């Protein structure tokens, strides 16, 4: 095996998806602890004080205690290199989250054992399904009261349309939580409370049918054996092929806060989750073991460092090897650039990078030339596909408090739109500026960032827009005719694309009927 093939085989790149408050930030910290990445995992409760969770860093996040921006963390574990992408857990950030899911090879779904499958999880799973991403499931919070585990598995199957195969099974919960039983290995992994901040040797009892197991389970033993027979009769047995096709999810139980069960999840990702996979471009499929470098930008983030007013473009490497100082082609601009200062991410610590391989996420300093969806290669002119924009669902008109700052406002919005924080539309018929977002919180984020980073204060006004559709048409004459007739509702987005802003659902249906040659697109590939 070549060095490069060996490096690719070591990589596991995955994202965590969950509903807010299911324990995602805690599990992120515990995973880093597994990789000895943070000596002491700061509990999330200390957020209100000075010690903020390492993966939540922007000012507004510190106030609200939510991870708005996607952060990337790399750490070693069992001779593998783990790339963990933390996705925004808050209701509103599905566009950013969506694109993060385009950059991973598998995902870890975290469910709150007391609540089961929640709306945000459903939305994220739909995104994973678009690419048949393999999903590992972790049912969290067993140190509290949880719902019946069989019910939880049924719900995963019914609501998320994926087969659930339990790998471990909980023994009791809340005050009676004794640990989990590993179905295939016939062993009990004993829960010892109070070790949330440190790694401890796990105590294991071999064989459920043993005196030691009976002593540990006490009064719970007979009931547990009975329940287990039911589980083994009714539940799916794990099938790795079905998992890799995105049809089945292995399910683990534990408590992230108690640092229990997280290591089994990480072992599963190392043992079963795919190494970096091939990626589609407009021209051909690119294999991770190819010698020549290639990658795509899936996210741009401003001001990761309050000390530097910089923007960082996050790039997923798809093939080859990054070496410090190498030349690569920025395909959209047709320009060759020398990259000497790419970054690797260790939570909020940033380090200069010497080399990186397929599956790794690297950060490029962006001075306004890099956009989401950009492809970089070692000379070849192709573009990676599957990194869409989504039609926003909410719209506001922007009103400037100081009319003299309109230049700063436009610059700020242009940069925030390139970064994917919002979408901006300029109507053809007047000088309004309209913002589009997938969730309300995005508007707050944009206003607070305009104020902090661009010294511009703005207010929002309601506007009569139901949804946006990108316009495509092969017939120039028809397009011109459409533009004349639909002038009142046409805008140009931040990327210069013609967009129809429909005032109502009925209006959009009528327009689609009336103009069969015009394509009204709800998503737009980044070009």
Curated annotation (Swiss-Prot):
Principal location listed in the UniProt entry: cytoplasm
Gene Ontology MF terms: GTP binding; GTPase activity; guanosine tetraphosphate binding; translation release factor activity, codon nonspecific; translation release factor activity, codon specific
Top-rank taxon: Bacteria
Domain tr-type G: 9-277
GO biological process, one term: regulation of translational termination
Keywords (A to Z) from UniProt: Cytoplasm, GTP-binding, Nucleotide-binding, Protein biosynthesis
Xref: CDD domains: RF3, RF3_II, RF3_III
Keyword flag Aminoacyl-tRNA synthetase: no
Compartment(s): Cytoplasm
GO cellular component terms listed in the entry, alphabetical order: cytosol
InterPro entries: EF-G-like_DII, EFG_III/V, G_TR_CS, P-loop_NTPase, PrfC, RF3_C, RF3_dom_3_sf, RF3_GTP-bd
Residues where GTP binds: 18-25, 86-90, 140-143
Classification via SUPFAM superfamilies: EF-G C-terminal domain-like, P-loop containing nucleoside triphosphate hydrolases, Translation proteins
Family: Belongs to the TRAFAC class translation factor GTPase superfamily. Classic translation factor GTPase family. PrfC subfamily.
PANTHER family, per the entry: PEPTIDE CHAIN RELEASE FACTOR RF3
Function, in words: Increases the formation of ribosomal termination complexes and stimulates activities of RF-1 and RF-2. It binds guanine nucleotides and has strong preference for UGA stop codons. It may interact directly with the ribosome. The stimulation of RF-1 and RF-2 is significantly reduced by GTP and GDP, but not by GMP.
NCBIfam families noted in UniProt: prfC, PRK00741.1, small_GTP
UniProt name for this protein: Peptide chain release factor 3
Source organism: Pseudomonas paraeruginosa (strain DSM 24068 / PA7)
Lineage: Bacteria, Pseudomonadati, Pseudomonadota, Gammaproteobacteria, Pseudomonadales
């Amino acid at each position: 095996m070549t060095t490069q093939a060996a490096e690719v085989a070591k990589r596991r790149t995955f994202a965590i998806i969950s509903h807010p408050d299911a324990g995602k930030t805690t599990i992120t910290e515990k995973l880093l602890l597994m990789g000895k990445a943070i000596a002491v995992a700061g509990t999330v409760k200390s957020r209100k004080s000075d010690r903020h969770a390492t993966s939540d860093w922007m000012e507004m996040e510190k106030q609200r205690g939510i991870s708005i921006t996607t952060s990337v963390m790399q750490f070693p574990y069992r001779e593998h290199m783990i790339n963990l992408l933390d996705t925004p857990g808050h209701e509103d950030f599905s566009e950013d989250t969506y694109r993060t899911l385009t950059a991973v090879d598998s995902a870890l779904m975290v469910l709150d054992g007391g609540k089961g499958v929640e709306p945000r999880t459903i939305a994220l799973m739909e995104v994973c399904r678009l690419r048949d991403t393999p999903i590992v499931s972790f049912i969290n919070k067993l140190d509290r009261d949880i719902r019946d585990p069989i019910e939880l598995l049924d719900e995963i199957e019914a609501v998320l349309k994926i087969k659930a195969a339990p790998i471990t099974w909980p023994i009791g919960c809340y005050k009676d939580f004794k640990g989990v039983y590993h179905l295939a290995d016939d062993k009990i992994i004993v829960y010892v409370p109070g070790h949330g901040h440190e790694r401890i040797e796990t105590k294991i009892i071999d064989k459920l049918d043993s005196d030691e197991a009976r002593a540990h389970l006490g009064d719970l033993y007979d009931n547990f054996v009975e329940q287990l027979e039911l589980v083994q009769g009714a539940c799916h047995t794990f099938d790795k092929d079905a998992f890799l096709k995105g049809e089945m999810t292995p399910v683990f139980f534990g408590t992230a806060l108690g640092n229990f069960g997280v290591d089994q999840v990480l072992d599963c990702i190392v043992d079963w989750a795919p190494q970096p996979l091939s990626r589609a471009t407009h021209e051909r499929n690119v294999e991770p073991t190819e010698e020549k470098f290639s990658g795509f930008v899936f996210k741009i983030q401003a001001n990761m460092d309050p000390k530097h007013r910089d923007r960082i473009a996050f790039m997923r490497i798809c093939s080859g090897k990054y070496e410090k100082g190498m030349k690569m082609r920025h395909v959209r601009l047709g320009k060759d650039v020398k990259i000497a200062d790419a970054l690797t991410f260790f939570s909020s610590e940033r380090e200069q990078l010497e080399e990186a391989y397929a599956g790794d996420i690297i950060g490029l300093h962006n001075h306004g030339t890099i956009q989401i969806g950009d492809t970089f290669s070692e000379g070849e002119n192709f573009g990676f596909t599957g990194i869409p924009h989504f039609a926003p669902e909410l719209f506001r008109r922007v009103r400037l408090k100081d009319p003299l700052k309109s230049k700063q406002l436009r610059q700020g919005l242009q940069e925030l739109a390139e970064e994917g924080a919002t979408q901006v539309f300029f109507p053809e018929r007047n000088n309004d500026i309209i913002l589009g977002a997938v969730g309300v919180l995005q508007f707050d984020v944009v206003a607070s960032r305009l104020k902090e980073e661009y010294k511009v204060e703005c207010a929002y006004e309601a506007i009569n827009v139901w949804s946006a559709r990108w316009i495509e048409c092969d017939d120039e004459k028809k397009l011109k005719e459409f533009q004349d007739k639909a002038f009142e509702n046409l805008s140009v987005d931040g990327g210069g694309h013609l967009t129809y802003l429909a005032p109502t659902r009925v209006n959009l249906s009528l327009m689609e009927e009336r103009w069969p040659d015009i394509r009204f697109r709800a998503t737009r590939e980044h070009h």
